[in-house]
Amino acid sequence: MLTVALPKGRIAEQTLDIFAEIFGGEFRFEGRELIMEKEGFCFLNVRNQDVPTYVEHGAADIGVVGLDVITEKELDIIQLLDMQLGKCKVAIGIKNEDELDWSRPNIKVATKMVNITKNYFAKKAVGVEVVKLYGSIELAPLVGLADAIVDIVETGNTMRENGLKVAEDIMDSSAHLIANKNSFYAKKEEILSLYEKIKAVVEKNG
């Protein structure tokens, strides 16, 4: 049996739809259900940020999670497939009236993605002071807490509604199929068989 960690919400539903397309039947978590067993799989319904942790530590053999989370956590896992779900960008946002000035010696940035932010600014050879927030990140430049933010952008509406604009894209992100390294070698045939089936559906729906 393969254990699959899925992030609560839309990505989990879309991934389970792929399993339904492959194996038939209905794949759904009922109500507040956190574990579901079906067709030789055990599905775990966990928080998005926790998926790669479950996979890295072997509590799940495989998982589905955004590339932004994988990049931020810098975990030792195997990336198998871009599932083309939940497409978005990680971007720098600033107030509409501001411009991003890379000549400044230091920029203060509010974000929950500390590693992505530090690494990006290091590549630009610009000092960065990171203020870690867990929500309502768009508020930070408006109240003088930060010069800019680094956040997930899908349509850009949330930034626009709060008087911000995208100054620069850092990376594209979408949901990826990942695997625990030990599981991949111990259950290689099982995992690769599932990988091929999922890949076929992703390419067909692409």
Predicted regions and their residues:
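Domain-level signature for soluble enzymes in the chorismate/prephenate branch of the shikimate pathway
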Residues: 1-206
